[in-house]
Amino acid sequence: MMTQANAYFYDGADVALLNGQYTDVFSLLGMHSANEGKALIVRCFLRNALSVDVISIKDGRKVASLDKVNEQGLFAGTLGRRVKPFLYLLRVEYPLCQLDIVDPYQFDSLLNSDDIYLFGEGSAERAYEFLGANWRQTQGVEGVHFCVWAPNAKRVSVVGDFNHWDDTRHVMRQHLANGLWELFLPNVVEGAHYKFDLVYQNGERHTKSDPMATQMECAPHNASIVPPKAHHSWNDTAWMSKRAATAWHKAPMSAYEVHLGSWRRKGEQGEQYLDYQDLIEQLIPYVKEQGFTHIELMPISEFPFDGSWGYQPVGLYAPTHRFGDANGLKAFVDACHQAGIGIILDWVSAHFPKDPHGLVRFDGTCLYEHEDPRKGTHPDWDTLIYNYDRGEVRSFLLSNACYWLREFHFDGLRLDAVSSMLYLDYSREPGQWLPNAYGGRENLEAISFLQILNQRLYQAFPGVCMIAEESTAFAGVTKPTDQQGLGFGFKWNMGWMNDSLSYLGRDPLYRQFHHHQLTFSLMYAYTEQFMLSVSHDEVVHGKGSLLHKIPGDDWQKFATLRAYYGFMWGHPGKKLLFMGCEFGQRNEWNHNQSLDWHLLAYEPHQGVQRWLKDLNHLYQAMPALSVQDYEGAGFSWLDCENSRDSIFTFVRYGLAGDAPLVFVINMTPQLHTGFRIGLPLAGDYREYLNSDSQIYGGSNQGNAGTVVAESLPWQGMAQSALITVPPLGCLVIGPATGLAEAN
């Protein structure tokens, strides 16, 4: 005897569907031809439904009532007089309500063959437009298109608050050839929470956050969130045009590194983060006044653990919830641009954490990471390393970089931990790593990815800056890719940072024996396009603040810090300084609390802040400090060998017609009067800056703002002058009026 079930279903398909074991759901559910093309059949699975009617969307008329096949929620029915498929909705009667549901199983695939090809090849730049949760319209019906890459899963479902997290309700369409699963869901609203429910080959079920989610819940929750339809309206056309026309390697670039969660806080106990509107009103004016050209944001992709500072992101495409939504972030970037401030994003592409809702063994296999821990696990952080050899993983990362630059108008990316990407034996002992195909230690796949990444981004986004945190002597980090370089625009100068901070911590009495720590960097300054960085890493984990590193009493500490900044701003290369360092934060950085802004009630801290501000403004005003940063003609030592006095003198040159600037830095507390220095031009000179000025908290030793050149050759120059060099001070001297012929 034929039952209702086997009248509409075949070969136990109904049982498999109920148990969540039927994967080819589009061949079963939805509207299909029946009776050799003489009728249509509609099948659906709606738990707890009492009755289901089929309603034509075109005219709103009821077409048929479906039979209830069983009590679990299977419904089916034949539409005898209809032979051509049409758009319909299901009018569902539940015990407490009636709902109209547009059946998702009536729609064809929305994937584009070109997108699929580029994604698998590893060259997709817009994968986020078809993967993840995207608002789409098809056949006049609006909904959310869900798509995820999980080639080794037996079944993937979308679960969320729109289906009571029922894994059997919305099983996705499988594309066997490329491992993609998709489902177009009408009746989903903005802000809906969702995840992907995956059945592994071993039968285990796991729910995962969407790797391409553009919004996520705050920890400890980890659902992905359907994004809003409304988008920010940009007003930064002037900035974007200026950016595209700027050669940043010849322009002033002074970046202020910011951790948004601890720059400043609000609330009675400082327990609340500033939101993006607060940051627009407070951070941007501060950065502008201080003279920084850029803000560099520490990572803002969603991360569950505050203590990771964002360097262990789980939602690489989702701006963290901590400071607002994506449109709020866009408004913040827009406001930066309208204020003439560039904004760089710290981007983590070297590794990802093992949080179970994240990428780790995403479909039951090592999908994003390497199977072998000798290549797939990072020993320092117990995280996982991306498999850069896999096309889909390269597309995931390349598209993410493009996403931040295209959708959020960021002006560049600073790549974290590049050294760990370049070397297979990074932080590993012999036997703990696998050599490349040629027996070497270089990670050839990662190198290739970085080259492609930089090449693509510089082509697609004119004027962006790609910056590498790279701590080894790997050759060609900032060389073009057609010269076998990695193609970055800038590289952090970790050697200069380590040497100079080591020198800073030495007693002035013994600095004469370590003079080379401030001069050696000029031996290799032009091998790469360096950025001098004093980042968050130097003021945390017991290292203490910059002030804490410096020996002596308070007066000596502040004077030394000002002189150090003078040396840094005079040294060739772009600049980066971590927040709080600009006013002499005393405690090392704590990500759980605001900077110690109360210190600005005290004059020494005001003085350091004012000095840094004046350095920045001079840096922007004088081309000599930037236009030839990466040309040997832009720098000349006057005296790099005066280790006895620990005095450093050098000249910075611009192009023809630009005023040269002379720097004199004294790193001992000894006052020097009648100290002769060579000068590049004849005539009167102006003391542009003196870190020992009273306005900066100094002892007011100097040259009363004026220096007069004499026709007495000195230090390779035809002109020279006798000056007063203040203790632990920095002087910046330049022509007072006009320019004569340089020597």
UniProtKB/Swiss-Prot annotation:
EC number(s) per entry: 2.4.1.18
Organism: Shewanella baltica (strain OS185)
Family the UniProt entry places it in: Belongs to the glycosyl hydrolase 13 family. GlgB subfamily.
Listed name of the protein: 1,4-alpha-glucan branching enzyme GlgB
Gene Ontology cellular-component terms listed: cytosol
Keywords for this protein: Carbohydrate metabolism, Glycogen biosynthesis, Glycogen metabolism, Glycosyltransferase, Transferase
Gene of this entry: glgB
Matches recorded under SMART domains: Aamy
PANTHER family listed in its UniProt record: 1,4-ALPHA-GLUCAN-BRANCHING ENZYME (PTHR43651:SF3)
Quaternary data: Monomer.
Catalytic activity: Transfers a segment of a (1->4)-alpha-D-glucan chain to a primary hydroxy group in a similar glucan chain
Pfam families to which the protein is assigned, alphabetical: Alpha-amylase, Alpha-amylase_C, CBM_48, GlgB_N
Catalytic residues, chain numbering: 416, 469
Native organism taxonomy: Bacteria, Pseudomonadati, Pseudomonadota, Gammaproteobacteria, Alteromonadales
Gene Ontology BP, a term: glycogen biosynthetic process
Listed pathway(s): Glycan biosynthesis; glycogen biosynthesis
